[in-house]
């Protein structure tokens, strides 16, 4: 819970779910023990703890408890992109329906949705864009590939607590280890890179050029609701301007 509010509420949730746990950086004092973003490069401590054995899984949340990541029993990352995939798998198995995630998220959610007979719809990056699209298509589950789970039955907002409950329910229902659960989902690799440009760079012109270059290709689907996304048969590229960071 990286020394933030998660340390206040997570013990109550885990106890209610019958989970035995050990807290790392659980004191809610606001003094982060490391970079609080729940991604692999920041989680060496808890990954090492898991690798030493004796645990079924690791749970990591960010300071405001809206991003959620899991670590397998062997100390390897479950994958932040796959938090939503696993939760959606469980929700769709009980409540058939549609799903939504942002354009920069893994294709695995689409695959799982189709397997359950639903329809996957992409949205522009940003929680408000995802929730708006979820309402439009009456999605039963959605979110973002950074570990953000949005479950309308609870509320229209990213919520790691809801994600934990649904993920653990899926794990219990499947009756397998977390690494075995991970192996049941399509394996996609994803790289998220930031490109720092000079202020004089005309990013919009670049995006228009990319769209023009690939728009006539038969095997490429171009989406321009948020930058430009190019979907090839076995890969994709998404280029966009950040709304939260200078470029």
Task: Put a short name on every predicted segment.
Residues 12-71:
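N-terminal small/polar loop signature for handling phosphorylated ligands or for N-terminal nucleophile
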Residues 18-25, 77-82, 117-125:
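Short hydrophobic/aromatic-enriched beta-strand-loop microsegments
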Residues 9-11, 66-84, 110:
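Short Gly/Thr/Asp-enriched flexible loops that form oxyanion-binding sites at enzyme active sites
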Residues 77-94, 98, 124-126:
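Short, acidic/small-residue loops that bind anionic groups at enzyme active sites
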Residues 62-63, 72-74, 232-234, 243:
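Short acidic-glycine loop/turn motifs at beta-strand connectors
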Residues 6, 80-87, 105, 160-163:
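Catalytic-loop motifs flanking and including active-site residues across diverse enzymes
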Residues 57, 95-247:
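Phosphate-binding and adjacent anionic-ligand microenvironments
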Residues 1-16:
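Rossmann-like NAD(P)H-binding beta-loop-alpha module
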């Amino acid at each position: 819970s990286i020394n933030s509010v998660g340390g206040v509420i997570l013990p109550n949730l885990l106890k209610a779910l019958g989970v035995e746990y050990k807290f790392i950086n659980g004191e809610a004092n606001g003094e982060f023990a490391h970079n609080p973003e729940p991604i692999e490069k920041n989680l060496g401590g808890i990954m090492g703890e898991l690798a030493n054995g004796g645990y079924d899984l690791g749970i990591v949340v960010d300071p405001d408890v809206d991003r959620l990541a899991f670590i397998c029993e062997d100390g390897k990352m479950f994958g932040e992109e796959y938090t939503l995939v696993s939760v959606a798998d469980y929700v769709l198995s009980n409540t058939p329906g549609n799903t939504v995630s942002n354009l920069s998220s893994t294709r695995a959610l689409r695959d799982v949705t189709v397997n359950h007979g639903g329809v996957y719809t992409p949205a522009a990056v940003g929680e408000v864009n995802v929730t708006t699209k979820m309402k439009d298509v009456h999605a039963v589950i959605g979110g973002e590939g950074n570990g953000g789970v949005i479950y309308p039955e609870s509320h229209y907002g990213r919520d790691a607590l809801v994600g934990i409950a649904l993920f653990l329910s899926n794990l219990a229902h499947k009756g397998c280890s977390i690494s075995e659960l991970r192996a049941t989902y399509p394996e996609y690799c994803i790289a998220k890179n930031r490109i720092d440009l000079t202020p004089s760079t005309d990013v919009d012109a670049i995006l228009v050029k990319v769209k023009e270059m690939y728009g006539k290709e038969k095997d490429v689907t171009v989406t321009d609701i948020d930058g430009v996304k190019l979907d090839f048969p076995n890969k994709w590229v998404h280029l966009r301007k950040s709304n939260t960071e200078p470029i």
